[in-house]
Design a protein with these regions (language model features):
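Gly/Pro-rich active-site loop or hairpin
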Residues: 11-23, 82-89, 125, 164-165, ...
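N-terminal pre-domain/capping segments
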Residues: 1-106, 180, 265-273
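Active-site beta-loop-alpha junctions enriched in small/polar residues
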Residues: 10-14, 44-46, 72-75, 117-119, ...
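Generic structural signal for well-ordered alpha-helices
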Residues: 29-31, 53-57, 98-102, 135-142, ...
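Short helix-capping segments at alpha-helix termini
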Residues: 62-65, 144-150, 176-182, 239-242, ...
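Active-site acidic/histidine proton-transfer and metal-coordination neighborhood
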Residues: 25, 81-184
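A structural motif
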Residues: 35-38, 105, 109-111, 210, ...
Length: 273
């Protein structure tokens, strides 16, 4: 096995967020990752204007760090933006924000994550209504992405955080209905532990449409500080030829830097066996 390993990072984040590295100076974060043997970073931004795309790309290249993806969920948490909102104005703002993120992703040649920005199925609305808005929104975004070098990954998220798109097969159904190769699946072991029945089957089902992975233990601490046996999952990734990053998205326990260093050590040992 030979996988790249990265970390979810943010310039700012609410207390309790599973972002182990939070620093308003993104260049210091890149330095830490490079100095400690990481391969990549996932950068969470409220707005893409918070960073200078060409400058951060050049700095990361100089340090040997890949930017794997841009996290977008802060726009949902702080501003309530989702592409399935009952309010047309909110949907339009969400789509525009994601297009702006895709502009940055095109500069960085990476993906954007649609996690919480997909929204939920609210009381009084049907799954079909929400599916329609999700598919129409993703069609527009996929067409926009096709003009640049960025792409979109949709994350399967557990039932305690959303009631919509919780398993790999549900995300794949949306992708199939959109019909664009600019859309792919994003799996997270923390969410999979609650929603999937097997570690291998969802990965094999996704195949080459799996383009992003988060790793955390069942308690959302770093891998190795919980109950998950990661070996079958990693074997399945190897079987499908997964060539993207394993990104640590875990709580900063006992602190951010310690958590990711321990997670890195655990994964490197596991991959080597």
């Amino acid at each position: 096995m030979n996988f790249k390993i990265g970390v979810t990072c943010a310039l700012d984040a609410p207390a309790g967020s599973p972002f182990p590295l939070v620093n308003p100076n993104v260049y210091e974060t890149v330095d830490f990752l490079a100095e400690n043997g990481f391969d990549s970073m996932e950068l969470h931004l409220l707005k893409p204007s918070e960073v200078d795309g060409p400058k951060i790309k050049e700095y990361c290249q100089k340090k040997g760090i890949l930017i794997s993806s841009i996290g977008t969920g802060m726009a949902y948490g702080k501003e309530g933006l989702s592409i399935t909102s009952p309010l047309k104005e909110t949907r339009e703002k969400a789509i525009q924000r994601l297009k702006d993120q895709l502009d940055l992703a095109s500069q960085l040649e990476c993906s954007i994550v649609i996690g919480s920005m997909r929204g939920e199925i609210p009381v009084g609305r049907s799954r079909e209504e929400v599916d329609h808005l999700m598919i129409e929104g993703c069609k527009e975004l996929a067409e926009y992405a096709s003009k640049g070098k960025g792409w979109i990954v949709i994350e399967a998220i557990d039932r305690f955080e959303t009631n919509y798109l919780q398993r790999a097969e549900e995300v794949l159904e949306v992708i199939d209905r959109v019909g664009s190769d600019r859309l792919a699946v994003h799996l997270d072991t923390y969410h999979m532990n609650m929603e999937e029945q097997d570690w291998k089957k969802p990965v094999l089902l996704c195949g080459n449409r799996l383009k992003h992975v988060h790793v955390a233990d069942n308690n959302r601490n770093y891998p190795g500080w919980g109950l998950i046996d990661f070996k079958p999952f990693l074997e399945a990734l190897e079987e499908i030829g997964y060539d993207q990053t394993l990104t640590l998205e875990c709580y900063p326990r006992p602190d951010g830097k310690t958590s990711v260093l321990r997670g890195l050590e655990y994964l490197r040992k596991l991959i080597a066996t």
